[in-house]
Protein backbone atom coordinates (compact mmCIF):
# COMPACT_ATOMS: atom_id res chain seq x y z
CA UNK A 1 0.00 0.00 0.00
CA UNK A 2 1.04 3.59 -0.56
CA UNK A 3 0.61 5.44 2.74
CA UNK A 4 2.01 8.81 3.80
CA UNK A 5 3.15 9.94 7.25
CA UNK A 6 -0.38 11.17 8.04
CA UNK A 7 -1.95 7.75 7.48
CA UNK A 8 -3.47 8.76 4.15
CA UNK A 9 -3.59 5.78 1.79
CA UNK A 10 -3.36 6.55 -1.91
CA UNK A 11 -6.34 4.82 -3.50
CA UNK A 12 -6.71 6.90 -6.64
CA UNK A 13 -4.83 8.80 -9.33
CA UNK A 14 -5.85 12.10 -10.85
CA UNK A 15 -4.14 12.34 -14.22
CA UNK A 16 -4.02 15.54 -16.23
CA UNK A 17 -3.95 14.65 -19.92
CA UNK A 18 -3.31 18.11 -21.34
CA UNK A 19 -2.95 21.78 -20.51
CA UNK A 20 -4.85 22.73 -23.65
CA UNK A 21 -8.46 23.83 -23.47
CA UNK A 22 -11.12 25.09 -25.87
CA UNK A 23 -12.71 27.28 -23.16
CA UNK A 24 -11.24 30.10 -21.08
CA UNK A 25 -13.04 29.95 -17.73
CA UNK A 26 -12.40 33.04 -15.65
CA UNK A 27 -11.28 31.06 -12.58
CA UNK A 28 -9.51 28.01 -14.03
CA UNK A 29 -6.99 26.30 -11.73
CA UNK A 30 -5.82 23.98 -14.51
CA UNK A 31 -5.22 21.33 -11.83
CA UNK A 32 -2.56 23.54 -10.30
CA UNK A 33 -0.27 23.21 -13.30
CA UNK A 34 1.88 25.84 -14.82
CA UNK A 35 2.81 25.58 -18.50
CA UNK A 36 4.17 22.18 -19.23
CA UNK A 37 6.12 20.66 -22.08
CA UNK A 38 4.99 17.72 -24.15
CA UNK A 39 1.91 15.76 -23.14
CA UNK A 40 1.83 12.51 -21.23
CA UNK A 41 1.77 9.56 -23.63
CA UNK A 42 -0.46 6.48 -23.72
CA UNK A 43 2.48 4.38 -22.53
CA UNK A 44 3.23 6.74 -19.64
CA UNK A 45 -0.39 6.66 -18.42
CA UNK A 46 -0.35 2.87 -18.70
CA UNK A 47 2.93 2.67 -16.80
CA UNK A 48 1.89 4.74 -13.78
CA UNK A 49 -1.53 3.05 -13.66
CA UNK A 50 0.03 -0.42 -13.83
CA UNK A 51 2.53 0.33 -11.05
CA UNK A 52 -0.02 2.02 -8.79
CA UNK A 53 -2.52 -0.82 -9.33
CA UNK A 54 0.00 -3.18 -7.70
CA UNK A 55 -0.27 -1.01 -4.58
CA UNK A 56 -4.05 -1.14 -4.44
CA UNK A 57 -4.93 1.97 -6.44
CA UNK A 58 -8.26 1.19 -8.06
CA UNK A 59 -9.64 4.58 -9.18
CA UNK A 60 -8.49 6.92 -11.91
CA UNK A 61 -9.80 10.39 -12.67
CA UNK A 62 -8.72 12.10 -15.90
CA UNK A 63 -8.71 15.86 -16.04
CA UNK A 64 -6.82 18.74 -17.63
CA UNK A 65 -7.11 21.26 -19.47
CA UNK A 66 -9.80 19.64 -21.52
CA UNK A 67 -9.09 15.89 -21.61
CA UNK A 68 -11.38 15.28 -24.59
CA UNK A 69 -9.01 17.32 -26.74
CA UNK A 70 -6.82 14.22 -26.59
CA UNK A 71 -7.75 12.32 -29.73
CA UNK A 72 -6.08 9.23 -28.28
CA UNK A 73 -8.25 9.20 -25.16
CA UNK A 74 -9.86 5.91 -26.24
CA UNK A 75 -6.42 4.40 -26.63
CA UNK A 76 -5.44 5.66 -23.16
CA UNK A 77 -8.54 4.04 -21.65
CA UNK A 78 -7.88 0.75 -23.36
CA UNK A 79 -4.29 0.71 -22.06
CA UNK A 80 -5.34 0.82 -18.38
CA UNK A 81 -5.17 -2.19 -16.04
CA UNK A 82 -8.50 -3.28 -14.49
CA UNK A 83 -9.85 -0.52 -12.20
CA UNK A 84 -12.93 -0.18 -10.01
CA UNK A 85 -13.73 3.34 -11.20
CA UNK A 86 -12.47 5.23 -14.25
CA UNK A 87 -13.89 8.70 -14.78
CA UNK A 88 -13.19 11.97 -16.53
CA UNK A 89 -13.96 15.56 -15.67
CA UNK A 90 -14.77 17.47 -18.84
CA UNK A 91 -16.33 20.70 -19.99
CA UNK A 92 -18.68 18.54 -22.05
CA UNK A 93 -18.39 20.48 -25.32
CA UNK A 94 -16.83 17.54 -27.18
CA UNK A 95 -18.66 14.77 -25.36
CA UNK A 96 -21.73 14.14 -27.53
CA UNK A 97 -19.79 12.65 -30.43
CA UNK A 98 -17.47 10.61 -28.26
CA UNK A 99 -19.55 9.33 -25.36
CA UNK A 100 -20.38 5.97 -26.93
CA UNK A 101 -16.84 5.05 -27.92
CA UNK A 102 -15.44 6.21 -24.56
CA UNK A 103 -17.92 3.94 -22.82
CA UNK A 104 -16.87 1.04 -25.05
CA UNK A 105 -13.22 1.79 -24.31
CA UNK A 106 -13.81 1.36 -20.57
CA UNK A 107 -14.82 4.75 -19.18
CA UNK A 108 -17.29 4.28 -16.31
CA UNK A 109 -18.65 7.78 -15.73
CA UNK A 110 -18.19 11.50 -16.40
CA UNK A 111 -18.29 14.77 -14.48
CA UNK A 112 -19.43 17.66 -16.67
CA UNK A 113 -18.75 21.26 -15.66
CA UNK A 114 -21.81 23.46 -16.03
CA UNK A 115 -21.91 26.52 -13.80
CA UNK A 116 -25.05 28.09 -15.20
CA UNK A 117 -28.21 27.25 -17.11
CA UNK A 118 -28.27 30.79 -18.43
CA UNK A 119 -26.61 31.09 -21.84
CA UNK A 120 -25.24 34.60 -21.27
CA UNK A 121 -23.82 33.76 -17.87
CA UNK A 122 -22.27 30.59 -19.29
CA UNK A 123 -20.65 32.65 -22.04
CA UNK A 124 -19.28 35.13 -19.50
CA UNK A 125 -17.84 32.41 -17.25
CA UNK A 126 -16.26 30.43 -20.08
CA UNK A 127 -15.38 33.48 -22.19
CA UNK A 128 -16.57 31.53 -25.23
CA UNK A 129 -19.70 31.81 -27.34
CA UNK A 130 -21.71 29.02 -28.94
CA UNK A 131 -20.70 26.23 -26.55
CA UNK A 132 -23.64 26.02 -24.12
CA UNK A 133 -25.88 23.72 -26.19
CA UNK A 134 -22.99 21.40 -26.90
CA UNK A 135 -22.55 20.87 -23.15
CA UNK A 136 -26.23 19.98 -22.70
CA UNK A 137 -25.97 17.59 -25.67
CA UNK A 138 -22.88 16.07 -24.08
CA UNK A 139 -24.73 15.43 -20.81
CA UNK A 140 -27.64 13.82 -22.70
CA UNK A 141 -25.25 11.60 -24.63
CA UNK A 142 -23.48 10.53 -21.44
CA UNK A 143 -26.83 9.62 -19.89
CA UNK A 144 -27.97 7.68 -22.93
CA UNK A 145 -24.84 5.50 -23.12
CA UNK A 146 -24.74 4.94 -19.34
CA UNK A 147 -21.68 6.96 -18.36
CA UNK A 148 -23.42 7.34 -15.03
CA UNK A 149 -23.78 8.80 -12.51
CA UNK A 150 -23.07 12.00 -14.40
CA UNK A 151 -21.89 14.65 -11.96
CA UNK A 152 -22.65 18.23 -12.84
CA UNK A 153 -19.87 20.44 -11.49
CA UNK A 154 -21.11 23.88 -10.51
CA UNK A 155 -18.53 26.31 -9.14
CA UNK A 156 -20.53 28.57 -6.83
CA UNK A 157 -19.90 32.18 -7.90
CA UNK A 158 -20.92 35.34 -6.08
CA UNK A 159 -23.11 37.60 -8.16
CA UNK A 160 -23.14 35.12 -11.05
CA UNK A 161 -24.94 31.86 -10.25
CA UNK A 162 -25.86 32.00 -6.54
CA UNK A 163 -29.54 32.24 -7.51
CA UNK A 164 -29.40 29.08 -9.67
CA UNK A 165 -28.94 26.41 -7.02
CA UNK A 166 -32.63 25.43 -6.85
CA UNK A 167 -32.84 25.32 -10.64
CA UNK A 168 -29.78 23.08 -10.81
CA UNK A 169 -31.19 20.81 -8.11
CA UNK A 170 -34.40 20.48 -10.16
CA UNK A 171 -32.31 19.68 -13.24
CA UNK A 172 -30.63 16.69 -11.56
CA UNK A 173 -33.70 15.44 -9.67
CA UNK A 174 -34.95 11.97 -10.58
CA UNK A 175 -32.15 11.28 -13.09
CA UNK A 176 -28.79 9.52 -12.73
CA UNK A 177 -27.25 12.96 -12.21
CA UNK A 178 -25.53 14.39 -9.14
CA UNK A 179 -25.08 18.11 -8.58
CA UNK A 180 -21.63 18.88 -7.21
CA UNK A 181 -21.42 22.40 -5.79
CA UNK A 182 -17.81 23.54 -5.58
CA UNK A 183 -16.23 26.35 -3.57
CA UNK A 184 -14.16 28.66 -5.76
CA UNK A 185 -10.42 28.54 -5.15
CA UNK A 186 -8.35 31.61 -5.82
CA UNK A 187 -6.81 31.47 -9.28
CA UNK A 188 -6.41 34.27 -11.83
CA UNK A 189 -7.73 36.90 -9.41
CA UNK A 190 -11.23 35.44 -9.66
CA UNK A 191 -11.66 35.38 -5.88
CA UNK A 192 -13.93 38.42 -6.05
CA UNK A 193 -16.53 35.87 -7.15
CA UNK A 194 -15.99 33.68 -4.07
CA UNK A 195 -19.38 32.85 -2.53
CA UNK A 196 -20.17 31.43 0.90
CA UNK A 197 -20.59 27.69 0.37
CA UNK A 198 -20.70 27.01 4.13
CA UNK A 199 -23.98 28.93 4.51
CA UNK A 200 -25.37 27.30 1.39
CA UNK A 201 -24.48 23.88 2.77
CA UNK A 202 -26.27 24.69 6.03
CA UNK A 203 -29.44 25.55 4.10
CA UNK A 204 -29.20 22.36 2.03
CA UNK A 205 -28.58 20.28 5.16
CA UNK A 206 -31.74 21.63 6.81
CA UNK A 207 -33.81 20.54 3.80
CA UNK A 208 -32.11 17.16 3.29
CA UNK A 209 -33.82 13.78 3.84
CA UNK A 210 -30.47 12.08 4.33
CA UNK A 211 -26.74 12.81 4.19
CA UNK A 212 -23.81 10.51 3.50
CA UNK A 213 -20.17 11.32 4.03
CA UNK A 214 -17.83 10.20 1.24
CA UNK A 215 -14.45 8.69 2.01
CA UNK A 216 -12.71 11.11 -0.35
CA UNK A 217 -12.16 14.43 1.38
CA UNK A 218 -15.00 13.52 3.79
CA UNK A 219 -17.31 15.42 1.49
CA UNK A 220 -20.99 15.21 2.29
CA UNK A 221 -23.65 14.24 -0.22
CA UNK A 222 -27.22 15.29 0.57
CA UNK A 223 -30.44 13.69 -0.70
CA UNK A 224 -33.28 16.12 -1.30
CA UNK A 225 -36.51 14.62 -2.60
CA UNK A 226 -34.91 12.54 -5.35
CA UNK A 227 -31.98 14.90 -6.00
CA UNK A 228 -28.38 14.21 -4.96
CA UNK A 229 -26.20 17.19 -4.06
CA UNK A 230 -22.54 16.94 -3.08
CA UNK A 231 -20.71 19.85 -1.50
CA UNK A 232 -16.99 20.44 -2.13
CA UNK A 233 -15.37 22.88 0.31
CA UNK A 234 -11.61 22.74 -0.07
CA UNK A 235 -10.56 26.10 1.39
CA UNK A 236 -9.03 26.20 4.90
CA UNK A 237 -10.50 22.74 5.34
CA UNK A 238 -8.09 20.53 7.24
CA UNK A 239 -10.56 17.62 7.27
CA UNK A 240 -10.74 17.77 3.45
CA UNK A 241 -6.94 17.63 3.15
CA UNK A 242 -6.57 14.97 5.85
CA UNK A 243 -8.75 12.74 3.68
CA UNK A 244 -7.01 13.48 0.41
CA UNK A 245 -6.27 10.01 -0.86
CA UNK A 246 -5.10 10.59 -4.38
CA UNK A 247 -1.90 11.33 -6.16
CA UNK A 248 -1.87 13.72 -9.06
CA UNK A 249 0.02 13.15 -12.29
CA UNK A 250 0.77 16.23 -14.37
CA UNK A 251 0.30 16.44 -18.11
CA UNK A 252 4.08 16.23 -18.56
CA UNK A 253 4.37 13.10 -16.42
CA UNK A 254 5.42 14.37 -13.03
CA UNK A 255 4.14 13.15 -9.68
CA UNK A 256 2.29 16.07 -8.03
CA UNK A 257 1.49 15.46 -4.36
CA UNK A 258 -0.83 18.46 -3.93
CA UNK A 259 -3.05 20.64 -6.14
CA UNK A 260 -1.88 23.80 -4.39
CA UNK A 261 1.88 23.16 -4.40
CA UNK A 262 4.34 23.22 -7.25
CA UNK A 263 7.68 23.08 -5.42
CA UNK A 264 7.61 19.32 -4.91
CA UNK A 265 6.94 17.90 -8.37
CA UNK A 266 8.93 14.84 -9.39
CA UNK A 267 9.39 13.89 -13.02
CA UNK A 268 9.22 10.18 -13.81
CA UNK A 269 9.59 10.56 -17.56
CA UNK A 270 11.94 8.07 -19.16
CA UNK A 271 12.28 5.90 -16.03
CA UNK A 272 11.93 2.11 -15.92
CA UNK A 273 9.07 0.53 -13.92
CA UNK A 274 11.45 -0.25 -11.05
CA UNK A 275 12.71 3.33 -11.00
CA UNK A 276 9.21 4.80 -11.12
CA UNK A 277 8.19 2.50 -8.27
CA UNK A 278 11.07 3.70 -6.08
CA UNK A 279 10.34 7.38 -6.79
CA UNK A 280 6.63 6.82 -6.18
CA UNK A 281 7.17 5.31 -2.71
CA UNK A 282 9.52 8.14 -1.72
CA UNK A 283 7.23 10.87 -3.07
CA UNK A 284 4.13 9.49 -1.38
CA UNK A 285 6.05 9.18 1.89
CA UNK A 286 6.82 12.91 1.80
CA UNK A 287 3.24 13.96 1.01
CA UNK A 288 1.62 16.50 3.37
CA UNK A 289 -1.88 17.90 3.77
CA UNK A 290 -2.00 21.50 2.55
CA UNK A 291 -4.36 22.70 5.30
CA UNK A 292 -3.43 21.06 8.61
CA UNK A 293 -5.26 20.75 11.90
CA UNK A 294 -3.60 21.37 15.26
CA UNK A 295 -5.54 18.52 16.80
CA UNK A 296 -6.34 15.87 14.16
CA UNK A 297 -2.91 14.67 13.12
CA UNK A 298 -3.78 11.44 11.34
CA UNK A 299 -6.46 10.26 8.95
CA UNK A 300 -9.32 8.68 10.90
CA UNK A 301 -10.90 5.42 9.70
CA UNK A 302 -13.85 5.89 7.40
CA UNK A 303 -17.37 5.61 8.68
CA UNK A 304 -20.72 6.51 7.18
CA UNK A 305 -22.33 9.50 8.83
CA UNK A 306 -26.08 10.01 8.88
CA UNK A 307 -27.52 13.41 9.92
N1 LIG B 1 -8.18 21.47 -3.02
C1 LIG B 1 -8.59 20.43 -3.73
N2 LIG B 1 -9.71 20.51 -4.45
C2 LIG B 1 -10.08 19.42 -5.12
C3 LIG B 1 -9.36 18.23 -5.13
N3 LIG B 1 -9.99 17.33 -5.89
C4 LIG B 1 -11.07 17.93 -6.36
N4 LIG B 1 -11.13 19.20 -5.89
C5 LIG B 1 -12.17 20.15 -6.18
O1 LIG B 1 -13.32 19.42 -6.52
C6 LIG B 1 -13.74 19.80 -7.78
C7 LIG B 1 -14.44 18.68 -8.48
O2 LIG B 1 -13.54 17.71 -8.87
P1 LIG B 1 -13.88 16.66 -9.99
O3 LIG B 1 -12.85 16.68 -11.03
O4 LIG B 1 -15.25 16.81 -10.45
O5 LIG B 1 -13.71 15.29 -9.34
P2 LIG B 1 -14.02 14.83 -7.92
O6 LIG B 1 -15.28 15.44 -7.43
O7 LIG B 1 -12.83 15.14 -7.14
O8 LIG B 1 -14.17 13.28 -8.05
P3 LIG B 1 -15.48 12.38 -8.10
O9 LIG B 1 -16.49 13.01 -7.18
O10 LIG B 1 -15.07 11.06 -7.59
O11 LIG B 1 -15.91 12.35 -9.51
C8 LIG B 1 -12.51 20.32 -8.45
O12 LIG B 1 -12.83 21.28 -9.34
C9 LIG B 1 -11.77 20.96 -7.34
O13 LIG B 1 -12.24 22.28 -7.18
C10 LIG B 1 -8.18 18.18 -4.36
O14 LIG B 1 -7.50 17.17 -4.28
N5 LIG B 1 -7.85 19.32 -3.69
C1 LIG C 1 -9.66 22.33 -14.26
S1 LIG C 1 -11.14 21.59 -14.86
C2 LIG C 1 -10.49 20.43 -16.03
C3 LIG C 1 -11.50 19.54 -16.67
C4 LIG C 1 -12.45 20.20 -17.67
N1 LIG C 1 -11.84 21.09 -18.54
C5 LIG C 1 -13.62 20.83 -16.95
O1 LIG C 1 -13.72 22.04 -16.96
O2 LIG C 1 -14.39 20.09 -16.37
C6 LIG C 1 -11.67 20.49 -13.52
C7 LIG C 1 -12.68 21.07 -12.58
O3 LIG C 1 -12.07 22.11 -11.85
C8 LIG C 1 -13.02 23.11 -11.61
N2 LIG C 1 -12.29 24.34 -11.30
C9 LIG C 1 -11.47 25.01 -12.12
N3 LIG C 1 -10.97 26.09 -11.51
C10 LIG C 1 -11.49 26.11 -10.27
C11 LIG C 1 -11.33 26.98 -9.15
N4 LIG C 1 -10.57 28.07 -9.22
N5 LIG C 1 -11.98 26.67 -8.02
C12 LIG C 1 -12.76 25.56 -7.95
N6 LIG C 1 -12.94 24.70 -8.98
C13 LIG C 1 -12.32 24.98 -10.12
C14 LIG C 1 -13.80 23.15 -12.91
O4 LIG C 1 -15.05 23.74 -12.74
C15 LIG C 1 -13.90 21.69 -13.24
O5 LIG C 1 -15.06 21.14 -12.67
S1 LIG D 1 -13.09 24.11 -19.36
FE1 LIG D 1 -11.98 23.27 -17.60
S2 LIG D 1 -9.82 23.43 -18.13
FE2 LIG D 1 -10.95 24.66 -19.60
S3 LIG D 1 -10.82 26.70 -18.78
FE3 LIG D 1 -12.74 25.81 -18.04
S4 LIG D 1 -12.25 24.87 -16.04
FE4 LIG D 1 -10.33 25.29 -17.12
S1 LIG E 1 -3.71 18.19 0.34
FE1 LIG E 1 -5.57 19.43 0.30
S2 LIG E 1 -5.18 21.05 -1.20
FE2 LIG E 1 -3.62 19.49 -1.51
S3 LIG E 1 -4.47 18.19 -3.13
FE3 LIG E 1 -5.05 17.27 -1.20
S4 LIG E 1 -7.06 18.08 -0.69
FE4 LIG E 1 -6.16 19.39 -2.30
From Swiss-Prot:
Pathway as given in its UniProt record: Cofactor biosynthesis; molybdopterin biosynthesis
Enzyme class, UniProt record, top EC level: lyase
Family: Belongs to the radical SAM superfamily. MoaA family.
Protein name: Probable GTP 3',8-cyclase
Stored PROSITE patterns: RADICAL_SAM
GO biological processes: Mo-molybdopterin cofactor biosynthetic process
Keyword set, alphabetical order: 4Fe-4S, GTP-binding, Iron, Iron-sulfur, Lyase, Metal-binding, Molybdenum cofactor biosynthesis, Nucleotide-binding, S-adenosyl-L-methionine
MF annotations from Gene Ontology: 4 iron, 4 sulfur cluster binding; cyclic pyranopterin monophosphate synthase activity; GTP 3',8'-cyclase activity; GTP binding; metal ion binding; S-adenosyl-L-methionine binding
Cofactor: [4Fe-4S] cluster
Reactions this protein catalyses: GTP + AH2 + S-adenosyl-L-methionine = (8S)-3',8-cyclo-7,8-dihydroguanosine 5'-triphosphate + 5'-deoxyadenosine + L-methionine + A + H(+)
Chain ranges of the Radical SAM core domain: 5-227
Binding site for [4Fe-4S] cluster 1: 21, 25, 28
InterPro entries from the UniProt entry: Aldolase_TIM (IPR013785), Elp3/MiaA/NifB-like_rSAM (IPR006638), MoaA_arc (IPR013485), MoaA_twitch (IPR010505), MoCo_biosynth_MoaA/MoaC (IPR050105), rSAM (IPR007197)
Amino acid sequence: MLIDAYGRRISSLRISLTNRCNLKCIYCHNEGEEDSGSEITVEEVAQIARICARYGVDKIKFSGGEPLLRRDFDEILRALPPMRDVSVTTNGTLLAARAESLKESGLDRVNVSLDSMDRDRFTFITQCKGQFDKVLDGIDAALSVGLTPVKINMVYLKGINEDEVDRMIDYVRGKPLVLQIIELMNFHGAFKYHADVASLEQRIKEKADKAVCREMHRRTKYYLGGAEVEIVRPIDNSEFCMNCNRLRITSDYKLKPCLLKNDNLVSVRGLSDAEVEAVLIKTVGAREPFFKSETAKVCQPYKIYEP
